[in-house]
Regions:
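Acidic/glycine-enriched connector segments
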Residues: 2-197
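Conserved non-transmembrane functional hotspots
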Residues: 201-526
Length: 526
């Protein structure tokens, strides 16, 4: 099924960032009932977001702190609506709920109990400390900035007279408006014992729905059903990996075949032209002048064939498309390898990967966090053994094999260049021999002096087009890294150590693919 511009073929996440006032209501009135009414307004606002932005085949993920007041309401709304939530905190949770500001403790005992329950709720898929500053204001500001950077849409729930603070919800609202991030400003008011919100959207025209790169237009549709919850990482990644692997194989074959044809046709054209020059005139005087056109016609046909393949490679962007889909395939293999390991996938966002892939990576990260949130440490040894056998050992065998193959072809191309270049030099030097010695050299040897340099350059062109030098070194160094990592995995003593080693390994493996992508995308045959 072809891709609709507004409907991604796999479910993609839309992050809804949140910030709000700690105290939403005046002291008077039935606080619990008023908060319930505000919570209802927030539920309606969140449920309206997909329709507001015409989202199809997308799922929401909340991103917020877990302070008292508005943050607590947002967490409850996400919990009731079964929206996964990532919680970013300015400090470790125990310190956070016991912190004190200028007006005393941030949390009362009942608020602390409620926050603790929400923090351990099944809908919370990540608990992350977003700041290491010793300054309280800086901690809250840095956390809000992290929420802002992670969000596609922002919701700010503010009391009617909320004042601006660089580290508060009004500051978040102001920053979102300046950065052209769509933001819903919800101002709370109480009239005759009824709490309502005045909702004002800003920057809606700047919303960009997450989409798949155009290379995946023909990916079969995988619909998302909110009632089924988020898919398993394997279930989510498999369609992408299979499609990308199939496309990568097709592009790879086309690129290598076209590269060989382009180079060989130009070498062959040179050989034909040289033969034509050497035999020129042999047909004259025999009434067969039309034979003079045979070699030019053959040469022209070969050159046009090579040129045609060259233009096709550039017109279809074969090299870049191949690199792109292979990068997707390797990313999904990487994520599948750590699917049982309790860790975030931050390395996907640290590596220099194409920005078009950000929606996919963010969605994969949410799916992975949801699947590993429980983190059963008692089974970490089983996870380690599986990772060793299915990832480390498999990749080690792969890189060893590819290193030997790349090195063999690199040496072959290098030998051809040296041999034919040396032969060309010797042929040229033969011109400096005496007349008597030159008479014994067949006249066709001069033609080899034209052909051999072209063959030498052709060998180097094949080596460059296949990226043999860089691939050989990459395969060797990566295999060496995996050999060093393996004993560390065997000696690991906990899930934390396993997670650290796995993330280090995956960042290195995917980093090598990212480096290859950068070279391959802009490295053609000619």
């Amino acid at each position: 099924m072809a891709n609709n511009h507004n409907t991604p073929n796999i479910p993609l996440v839309v992050h809804v960032g949140f910030s709000g006032s700690r105290r939403l209501l005046p002291e008077a009135g039935n606080q619990s009932e008023l908060l319930r009414q505000i919570e209802s307004c927030m539920t309606d606002a969140l449920q309206a977001i997909p329709e507001k932005f015409n989202l199809n085949n997308n799922f929401l993920c909340g991103v917020s702190q877990l302070a008292v007041g508005a943050d607590t309401l947002f967490a409850r709304v996400c919990q009731e609506a079964k929206i996964p939530q990532r919680v970013f905190l300015p400090q470790h949770f125990d310190e956070f709920v016991n912190a004190k500001g200028t007006q005393g403790s941030d949390f009362s005992e009942s608020e602390k109990e409620q926050a603790t329950k929400l923090f351990g709720s099944d809908h919370v898929i990540q608990q992350r400390v977003a700041s290491s500053s010793n300054d309280r204001t800086t901690r809250f500001e840095q956390t809000n900035l992290e929420i802002l950077n992670a969000s596609d849409v922002i919701v700010c729930l503010l009391r009617e007279d909320a004042k601006e603070s660089v580290a508060g919800a009004v500051g978040m609202l102001k920053r979102a408006k300046r950065r052209n991030i769509p933001v819903l400003e919800m101002r709370v008011s109480v009239d005759n014992g009824i709490a309502t919100t005045k909702d004002i959207w800003h920057n809606t025209e700047h919303f960009q729905a997450p989409t798949l790169p155009s290379q995946f237009n023909e990916l079969e549709m995988v619909p998302y059903d909110a009632n089924d919850g988020l898919p398993d990482p394997i279930e989510y990644c498999t369609p992408l990996k299979q499609f990308a692997s199939s496309e990568a194989n097709w592009y790879s074959k086309w690129f290598h075949r076209a590269a060989a044809i382009i180079i060989l046709t130009h070498v062959a054209a040179t050989i034909v032209a040289t033969i034509g020059l050497l035999t020129h005139g042999s047909n004259h005087g025999h009434g067969e002048e039309h034979h003079d056109y045979v070699f030019p016609i053959i040469e022209l046909s070969l050159l046009l064939l090579g040129l045609g393949f060259h233009l096709y490679l550039h017109w279809r962007h074969i090299g870049k498309s191949w690199a792109f889909v292979r990068l997707i395939a390797e990313t999904n293999r990487s994520v599948s390898a750590v699917r049982k390991i309790n860790c975030g996938l931050e390395y996907l966002f640290r590596l220099p990967l194409p920005s078009e892939l950000k929606p996919v990576f963010r969605s994969i990260n949410v799916v992975h966090l949801n699947a590993t949130k429980s983190g059963a440490d008692e089974q970490w040894e089983t996870c380690r053994d599986e990772y060793l056998s299915k990832r480390i050992d498999n990749q080690l065998a792969f890189y060893d094999d590819r290193y030997l193959r790349a090195e063999k072809w690199r040496k072959c191309c290098s030998w051809m260049f040296t041999a034919f270049s040396t032969a060309s030099v010797l042929i040229i030097l033969s011109n400096f021999l005496g007349d008597q010695l030159r008479e014994h050299i067949p006249h066709w040897v001069a033609g080899l002096g034209i052909i051999f340099p072209v063959i030498a350059v052709g060998a180097m062109s094949l080596s460059a087009a296949a990226d043999l030098e860089a691939r050989s070194e990459t395969f060797r160094s990566t295999a060496s890294f995996l050999r060093e990592q393996r004993p560390k995995f065997e000696d690991a003593m906990s899930m934390n150590e396993l997670s650290q080693l796995a993330l280090e390994t995956e960042e290195r493996l995917l980093g090598e693919t990212a480096n290859w992508f950068s070279r391959r995308s802009y490295l053609g045959v000619a």
